[in-house]
Amino acid sequence: SSAASDVYKRQRLYNKILPEVVSKFSPGTFYWPSSPFSRHGAPSKENIGDRHFWDVWGGEKSIDTYLTARSRFFSEYGFQSFPDIETIKRYAPNKSDWNIYSEVMMSHQRAGINANKKIETYLIDEFGKPHDFQSFLYMNQLLQGDAIKMAIEAHRRDMPFCMGTLFWQHNDCWPVASWSSRDYYGRWKAQHYFVRDAFRDILVSPCLKAGNLDIYVVSDRLNKAHSQLKISFMKFSGEVVASFEKDVVIESNSSKKYFSVDLEELLKDLDTRNIFVFLELITDEGDTYSNVHFFNRQKDLDYPTVTIHKEIKIIEGGYELSLISEKFARGVYVSLPGNNCVLSNNFMDLLPKKLVRLNVYTCLLYTSPSPRDTER
């Protein structure tokens, strides 16, 4: 039959012709015919071959499902968000369309008629209900970033069982709500900043297990890294509840647990809704890696109202922006009119009384008619 002939041609192309071509012109190069693929049994299983994992998003399972999913190589998984408001203004210039269920917003959705509802359901479950359209966009981007960051960290901690993780997707071919980490116009979503850090050569990563907080360090370096590990349990106000320091030697090309603490004993009589953990690893060469962990869903955390102090200094190509807050500030977002700029960092967690600097590259001129401080 025609169908059987097509299958034969495809199998011959991928399983005979292409591997022979690769072997001829690039001897020694490993050949993998497709994705997902397994040389033994069905593809997309957790213990053989590579896996496309869509239980989260596609299967509508909770985001923390990423923590327990396993694969030798995650070759596809993702979570959707809307693009930046300035991108949306290009295809929805009328504020009357600024509703995720408007015709124009539904039309600019990569995953069909149910996808916007799916985004909203996940968002309300994790963050609560936004008070307006732009808050929805901002919180949705944080949610996407948190979800994919969680997945990448879990995959890297599972090294060497899992030796690869590729999120879907990097960019868009039209302005749309999608799984991308950069939108059609190249504007970075929160996810792009988060995965950049999650893929650094060294990752310090927390993991809750059996009532303990385990601290893993994952290294892709080919040499050992003599380092100092710092763990701080803090209230959002800045009060330190407990802290630990430990000199560690990070093994090359490895994932290993370097610290563990019993949370029931440590946090008894404390309200975990206003507590977070700050992790910091400093190598002898001065390289710094950090992470933040919360004990509740974002909507259940008791975030304080904060005042963010800012200073701006002119640098080549733009400005250096310094930010500091007396209290913890989650996901601080910086934008300029039209958002025609490149930022070295964004969607940042500001630790109490800790200065953060970022570069803002833009051709816009700076004037200062507004107060230096921002309340949020």
Where do the language-model regions lie?
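Beta-strand-rich binding/interaction modules
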Residues: 213-249, 258, 276-278, 329-337
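Substrate-binding clefts and catalytic carboxylate motifs of secreted carbohydrate-active enzymes
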Residues: 22-23, 33-35, 55-223
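C-terminal accessory/binding modules appended to enzymatic or scaffolding proteins
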Residues: 307-348
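Terminal connector regions
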Residues: 264-302, 364-368
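Active-site neighborhood of glycoside hydrolase catalytic domains
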Residues: 2-38
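Intrinsically disordered, low-complexity Pro/Gly/Ser/Thr-rich segments with frequent PxxP/GP/PP motifs
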Residues: 239-270, 340-364
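Aromatic/hydrophobic beta-strand junction motif of beta-rich domains
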Residues: 215-220, 321-325, 360
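Single conserved hydrophobic/aromatic residue that forms the stacking wall/gate
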Residues: 1-4, 8, 366-376
